């Protein structure tokens, strides 16, 4: 029954003009090593109305430069209001490439906490629902559907959480998890239990 219901919700969401939009907010601090692959992963969501907001939280490495170069970003003027307190923005970027039309990059002063970076992303979010993740996380391609599904079925629900696992031993293909493997490292096993 749940599978059938999910399929019906998916069909309605894909065709309805009332589909709720979702903003994925992902802070990044010194993530230059993996930022391009991870942002590509976030952009592969199978959902009709979403945006990805990467918040460069004062990185001291090449995180911002890699984002600009790989996603054809240009600085854009943006009138925003700080609805939620955070350290000041330096610049805002959007892509000139249609394939990345739903990507926004905020370059802001480091706030010292992840919460400050998330607040910065929420200040530019255009949708009523948001997913708070890290820029080094890999989301399943239907993660937004999995989060929106319970909300559409029960309007009393105000928050949804996903299952998190450590990437120790995961097999990735095209920025998607294709196989889960249990690590042989006892420390990694305890990390999995913690999450």
What is each residue range found by the language model?
Residues 20-23, 51:
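Cell-envelope/extracellular polymer assembly enzymes that use nucleotide-activated donors
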Residues 40-49, 69-77:
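Short, acidic, metal-binding catalytic loop of nucleotide-sugar glycosyltransferases
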Residues 76-117, 123, 141, 146-195:
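Long helical/loop segments within the catalytic core of UDP-sugar-dependent glycosyltransferases
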Residues 6-9, 31-44, 59, 65, ...:
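Short, well-formed alpha-helical segments that are part of the catalytic scaffolds
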Residues 134-138:
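The conserved acidic donor/metal-binding loop of glycosyltransferases
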Residues 1-18:
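N-terminal membrane-anchoring/stem segments of glycan-assembly enzymes
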Residues 130:
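Short aromatic/hydrophobic "clamp" motif used to bind/position activated sugar donors
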Residues 56-76, 110:
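A conserved acidic beta->alpha catalytic loop
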């Amino acid at each position: 029954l749940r599978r059938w219901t999910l399929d019906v919700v998916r069909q309605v969401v894909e065709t309805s003009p009332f589909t709720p939009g979702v903003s994925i907010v992902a802070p990044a601090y010194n993530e230059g090593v993996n930022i391009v692959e991870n942002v590509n992963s976030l952009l592969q969501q199978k959902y009709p109305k979403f945006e990805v907001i990467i918040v460069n939280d004062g990185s001291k490495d090449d995180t911002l430069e890699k984002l600009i170069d790989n996603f054809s970003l240009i600085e854009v003027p943006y009138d925003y209001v700080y609805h939620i307190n955070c350290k000041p923005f330096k610049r805002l970027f959007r892509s000139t490439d249609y394939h990345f039309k739903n990507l926004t990059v905020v370059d802001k002063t480091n706030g010292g906490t992840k919460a400050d970076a998330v607040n910065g992303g929420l200040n530019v979010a255009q949708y009523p629902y948001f997913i708070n993740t890290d820029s080094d996380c890999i989301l399943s391609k239907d993660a937004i559907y999995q989060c929106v599904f319970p909300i559409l079925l029960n309007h009393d629900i105000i928050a949804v959480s996903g299952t998190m696992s450590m990437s120790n031993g995961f097999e990735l293909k095209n920025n998607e998890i294709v196989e889960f493997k249990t690590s042989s490292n006892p420390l990694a096993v305890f990390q999995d239990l913690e999450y």
